[in-house]
Amino acid sequence: MYLGFEQVALVGQVFESFVLEHHKNEIAQILTEKEEHAHYSLVVNAMTLFEANMEIGEYFNAFPNEVLPVFDNALRCAAMSFLQSCSEKYTFLMKQNLHARITGLPVCPELTREHIPRTRDVGHFLSVTGTVIRTSLVKVLEYEQDFMCNKCKHVVTVKADFEQHYTFKPPIACSNEEGCNSTKFTCLSDSSSPASCRDYQEIKIQEQVQRLSVGSIPRSMIVVLEDDLVDSCKSGDDITVYGVVMQRWKPLYIDMRCDLEIVLKANYISVNNEQPCGVVINEEVRKEYEDFWVKYRNNPLEGRNEILASLCPQVFGMFVVKLAVAMVLAGGVQRIDSAGTRVRGESHLLLVGDPGTGKSQFLKYAAKITPRSVLTAGIGSTSAGLTVTAVKDSGEWNLEAGALVLADGGLCCIDEFNSIKEHDRTSIHEAMEQQTISVAKAGLVCKLNTRTTILAATNPKGQYDPDESISVNVALASPLLSRFDLVLVLLDTKNEDWDRIISSFILESKGCPRKSDKLWSMEKMKTYFCLIKNLQPKMSQDANVILVRYYQLQRQSSCRNAARTTIRLLESLIRLAEAHARIMYRDVVTTEDAITVVSIMESSMQGGALLGGVNALHTSFPENPREQYRLQCELLLDKLGLQKLLEEELQRLERQQSEDSLESDLGESATNLVGHKVVHSECVMEETFSTFEASSLPDETHLGVTGSAAFIQTPKKTISDMTKSDDTIRKGTITPAEQNRGISTDAESSLKQGNAQPLAGGHLSENNLTKCTDNSLGWFDTLQSIQMSPITKQREGCTAEKLQQEVLPVSTESSCHPADKKVVNLGGRNKLEVLQASGSSPGGNGRDLSNHTVTCGSSPERNKRDLSNHIVTEHVSKKWRRINKDSLCGKNVPSFQPQSENTDSAPVCSSVPLHSTPDVAQRRKRIIAQVEKQSKAEVEDPDTKARLAQLAKFSFKRHSKLVHSPAGDTDTASNAQKHDHPVQKITLSEKLNNLGRTVNNVDKSSNSVNGSKQQKHVENTSKQTVITQKSNFESNTLNAPVHETKLNEGCDSRKVSSSTLAKLARFSFSPPPENQAAETSKETLILPRAVAPGSKRKCFELNPSTDKTTMSSKSLFSTTDLDDEELDVDWEAEIKGNQRIAT
């Protein structure tokens, strides 16, 4: 079936009007060209054309071979019409060889194919995507001839038959209308001077490997190019061909089988090398990645590790390998030096490891996320298969591209690299360094580009011997090894911890695989690596200094590899530094990039001049990337002798850390503020917001009563920080400046940290309120002696009036005159002057100051009015300040036992939850009132008064050999009485409280005579203390209500029986052994290891979770110093253990 005359006229008219409307500028540009006989193309989008007229689309899909010549004629008519309508005709020149090129077909299975077409597609116009594997020479094709009838001299034009390889078949009979029936013709065109010729070329395309399923062999087909399409592509290009599927065969012979083949007659070719396949990069995508790096601007290494964790996530750990693969995929910047020589920007990586170490997994993943990649194995690769081969086809020699040529501009992955034969491996030397392949085969001399990154994997030759060189272990020549920028060694050494963690990782992924939300998808990774290749980072001066100094050190090393430590090493360092800057999404190579590259190079077998090689298999992701980088800076820059750069880099890290902590504090404060708005009423919301504004600065610690609510901002502290502060207090290492200010070491460090958080949503907790009701500085003592600072939740239904009633006992007897307020400057910031006093009772160790509290003569009503907008401070004499300093420094101060502190400070109802209801609070008040009545009743007893009078004359005798003696406190008390101090009011209830504490501690000290019993008692007490601290910390971590554990429930410090007072007169103090006291103090320092909450698998934590990343003296990364406790994955046993501790 063919198109009729009317259909041809319709198609011509519609296409001519369409071209004049949409492509008028292109026609004008073609007509301005000088060459008249050249071929010119006009690219037309098929979607736009079909939308203009659907009937054209139907004709085009049904009869493409007939419609395309009509399009060319209509284009010439449109050019003629434009030329006639143009006023300046002298600037244009009419062209005859115009061709309409159709592109942009609708994406549907009928028109778009990713695989080679089959027989059913013959006669259809399709778009086929593939890779050019062979290009033939350009030929001259005679497409038509003229034949003249010998009888009537009629001339007949015959076109070459495409289906029979462009052969000419003379006419059978004369077609003259006058009725000439002659069958003899003479060809007018001579073979030496053909009349009608055009350029002709055949190429061979192959299906793209990444679009095939596993095990499928890629098929290929011939594509015919004519006219201006000739030489539009080369071997290795990814192209999309738009054309008509046709079949052709050679001339038929008797008793010969017809050789039929399917070819694609191209109408247009689009080269896709510059455009990544399946990757769309627009402003929205760029904004997404920019927001990601803005989030990690203060800790960019953590953002980089998140990207590395998404690289080949099925392989556990191997941090160094993943970082090296990511840098190789990112690549460096290609440049041309002053001599005109092109310096490659692509890096090469060789993975050397034992079988089963995950080398092939990295190769497969890298090939997937790279748009243009080739994956091959060395066992089946030859020199011709890797580079280029010469093939004879149809009597002529053609060149077929190999793996390296096909991967031009992409990635070539070669597995089992050592399986390639020796003479075949030498053929890729030029491809790796000069990135070209020079060919002189079968009379063909040419040079092909191989601008590719090579990622190879190999096994060592037998057992890897660390004493031998890498060339001997791998059986590769030094010239080939020196062309690899990195050579990482993965040794499967015997490590039970590593085997346990790998097995648990694999079994979990097999049993219940789940995808982490934090990991990037493969499409996102593919888009990101395509995006960062557009960055062109420049080297900074600091990075140049580090790389040059390291290169010089490598050259001076006694154990250097002469084949490696050439100028290629310096170029490799530059390329890898630029690649790391690309990964970090920067356009400048900084000191951070240079330090990271030197660390990777030291882990590679190409380095090792500073610290020696590292087994990259057992390296893990660091818990704190900033701390690990800090250690790398201190180690490497110190070895390189760059102290100035080290100081600058450490200062930069400090700034980043402070900014990061500031932002986190502001975020937490904002979260607390939102929580207050939900819970409190409107009036309380206003007070909370005003107080938050006053206390939100990170450098200030506020203590005051604002409005009707008390706010204390307690700094957050880790276990390690608290351990250090306790050690500092016990050793007495307090600076003179801190002694002059009278502030404890813990409090000062808390003030300097700046990352404070409002306690219990900004309000004073109930425990602290209860401790402060004895008119002492107990709230400040808790800041000094606290081990774990639980942050409690705000109670529900808490109103301003109730808070005012609870705070009122704190302020009724304290100094509240405005003149008593005093603010001093501490460390360059305005701080509230906190004065700490120490009492003389041996049991309290300065914890109770009720005997020396300055009372205020004002009434409670007045205090209630004055406390609305004032800050409450308590002042004591200078003598008491000096006593406190002596107690902190350990001068003549009795030892402090943890159990005594808990006994003294534990209130009557300390076990009541902090989120108790108003009924419980009222019941607690009634219990306190009853206790006070009972204490007053005992004081009024005359026998009790007599015993108190006797007790006033009681004193301990000082023992010369004792370290922890109560005599020091007695002397301190006597000295305090001699000092000129105003007379203070002391109530009987306060005396009883102090005497009760004294009796309790004396009873405990008397038990120390029996050595074995005391030792058991100390061990049990220390265990209880550790359990209490751990349970408090876990409850604080999980944001649960905090319950204080009573260690001595039967002992009440507020009540002292008469029999106990009578025994005091006959009491004789016997000291505990000195070594026992030392063991006790040492045991009290033991803190539980905190288990951070979250969904993170515990078996993944390869390193102890400390404040700094633990590293060996010669290790730049976290290696296999594993802890059995952290690698334990028996979660059921751990949960049961936590439940037992909690109960």
Curated annotation (Swiss-Prot):
Biased composition (Polar residues): 736-756, 851-860, 895-905
Enzymatic class: hydrolase
Annotated Pfam families: MCM (PF00493), MCM_lid (PF17855), MCM_OB (PF17207)
Catalyzed reactions: ATP + H2O = ADP + phosphate + H(+)
CDD domains: MCM9
Compartments, as annotated in UniProt: Nucleus
GO cellular component, one term: MCM complex
Gene Ontology biological process: DNA damage response; DNA replication; double-strand break repair via homologous recombination; regulation of DNA-templated DNA replication initiation
Stretches assigned to coiled coil: none
Region of interest (Disordered), residue spans: 721-767, 838-864, 895-915, 998-1022
Entry keyword set: ATP-binding, DNA damage, DNA repair, DNA replication, DNA-binding, Helicase, Hydrolase, Nucleotide-binding, Nucleus
Job description of the protein: Component of the MCM8-MCM9 complex, a complex involved in homologous recombination repair following DNA interstrand cross-links and plays a key role during gametogenesis. The MCM8-MCM9 complex probably acts as a hexameric helicase required to process aberrant forks into homologous recombination substrates and to orchestrate homologous recombination with resection, fork stabilization and fork restart. In eggs, required for MCM2-7 loading onto chromatin during DNA replication. Probably not required for DNA replication in other cells.
Annotated protein name in UniProt: DNA helicase MCM9
Gene symbol of the encoding locus: mcm9
